[in-house]
Amino acid sequence: MAKKVQAYVKLQVAAGMANPSPPVGPALGQQGVNIMEFCKAFNAKTESVEKGLPIPVVITVYSDRSFTFVTKTPPAAVLLKKAAGIKSGSGKPNKDKVGKVTSAQVREIAETKAADMTGSDVDAMARSIAGTARSMGLVVED
């Protein structure tokens, strides 16, 4: 018989740096999950990813307090900031431009995020990423 799902916990955790401190500890402790077990499993799964990159994770907690988790790709905004070499986006994206990204970089990010995005093809996903870039105050160059 299938296990009964108790809760879904969605978090963003830095790759390879999961530890019992907030936000991981309180979110999982509330559900009665073994926090260190999750931290070890998450860090092992994300050791190939650049350390410190925020990774969205969805943890499925079952009624017997066991769990499974699925990692996603880093948020588009984080990948765009890394590609443009900036710390943060613009407070006034329509007026103040803070950096530039090439359409090749945008396409590369779209290919990276393809597994998590709902787009019919890479071009559609690239347009979506370009829209995110514009809303951050980045200029997309050809």
From Swiss-Prot:
CDD domains from the UniProt entry: Ribosomal_L11 (cd00349)
Entry keywords, A to Z: Methylation, Ribonucleoprotein, Ribosomal protein, RNA-binding, rRNA-binding
GO function term, MF aspect, one: large ribosomal subunit rRNA binding
SUPFAM superfamilies found in the cross-reference section: Ribosomal L11/L12e N-terminal domain (SSF54747), Ribosomal protein L11, C-terminal domain (SSF46906)
GO annotation (BP), single: translation
InterPro entries: Ribosomal_uL11, Ribosomal_uL11_bac-typ, Ribosomal_uL11_C, Ribosomal_uL11_C_sf, Ribosomal_uL11_CS, Ribosomal_uL11_N, Ribosomal_uL11_N_sf
Oligomeric form and interacting partners: Part of the ribosomal stalk of the 50S ribosomal subunit. Interacts with L10 and the large rRNA to form the base of the stalk. L10 forms an elongated spine to which L12 dimers bind in a sequential fashion forming a multimeric L10(L12)X complex.
Family: Belongs to the universal ribosomal protein uL11 family.
Reported function: Forms part of the ribosomal stalk which helps the ribosome interact with GTP-bound translation factors.
PANTHER family: 60S RIBOSOMAL PROTEIN L12, LARGE RIBOSOMAL SUBUNIT PROTEIN UL11M
Name recorded for this polypeptide: Large ribosomal subunit protein uL11
The organism of origin for this protein: Pectobacterium carotovorum subsp. carotovorum (strain PC1)
Gene label: rplK
